[in-house]
Amino acid sequence: MAQISKYKRVVLKLSGEALAGEKGFGINPVIIKSVAEQVAEVAKMDCEIAVIVGGGNIWRGKTGSDLGMDRGTADYMGMLATVMNALALQDSLEQLDCDTRVLTSIEMKQVAEPYIRRRAIRHLEKKRIVIFAAGIGNPYFSTDTTAALRAAEVEADVILMGKNNVDGVYSADPKVNKDAVKYEHLTHIQMLQEGLQVMDSTASSFCMDNNIPLTVFSIMEEGNIKRAVMGEKIGTLITK
């Protein structure tokens, strides 16, 4: 019997660092294979899935800006880094016989389709895995904001935020403060008021304004994406 997901359509947000593993840089083949297997498992259920991958394992626009680069140029470099991650994930998924499409906000027709909202929705309706890359196509906006915007555009039920170094949202950094408390449930306004570093304030405000729930969980535990899709209580749930 096919397992039933809680959600019809989800957006999975992965940090670039999640693909790097312990080295913190580049793409770890073992990690990306594990992520692809988890995504493929969800795709076989009755759930449509879109993925957004950051580029921090290759380049961070803010880092370049802090070093004196033009912020716009640095951010565009970061967008290109997300395309590299997206293509690597697409390749891993296709090796698992998953029909996958990469849609980019910056046109590069030789390697991916340009992002068109209706096309993205159509791919999802056809049960294809969609990977959004190159951010929203504009500098100064993070991939967290991309996840929020794309989730609203494709009418996703939830954003699943897979983290590589934490299993939910805590009152403080659990690696630094042993008294940090893990939250099972939060509201968007709490997250903003308490300055909890789940996503940047632009993305948080957008999710709150558009009533988009988030589940924050560890991507490093095998099977957690499936558990999140099935609505199991893992990580932290954030709602309006």
UniProtKB/Swiss-Prot annotation:
Compartments, as annotated in UniProt: Cytoplasm
Positions contributing to UMP binding: G55, D75, I136, G137, N138, P139, Y140, F141, S142, T143
GO biological process: 'de novo' CTP biosynthetic process; UDP biosynthetic process
A GO cellular-component term linked to this record: cytoplasm
Record-listed E.C. numbers: 2.7.4.22
Activity control summary: Allosterically activated by GTP. Inhibited by UTP.
Gene Ontology molecular-function annotations: ATP binding; UMP kinase activity
Domain of life according to the entry: Bacteria
InterPro entries linked to this entry: AceGlu_kinase-like_sf (IPR036393), Asp/Glu/Uridylate_kinase (IPR001048), Uridylate_kinase (IPR011817), Uridylate_kinase_bac (IPR015963)
ATP-binding keyword on record: yes
Major site of localization recorded for this protein: cytoplasm
Region Involved in allosteric activation by GTP, residue ranges: 21-26
Pathway involvement of the protein, from the record: Pyrimidine metabolism; CTP biosynthesis via de novo pathway; UDP from UMP (UMPK route): step 1/1
Family according to the record: Belongs to the UMP kinase family.
PANTHER family: URIDYLATE KINASE (PTHR42833), URIDYLATE KINASE PUMPKIN, CHLOROPLASTIC (PTHR42833:SF4)
Assembly description: Homohexamer.
Protein name: Uridylate kinase
GN (gene name): pyrH
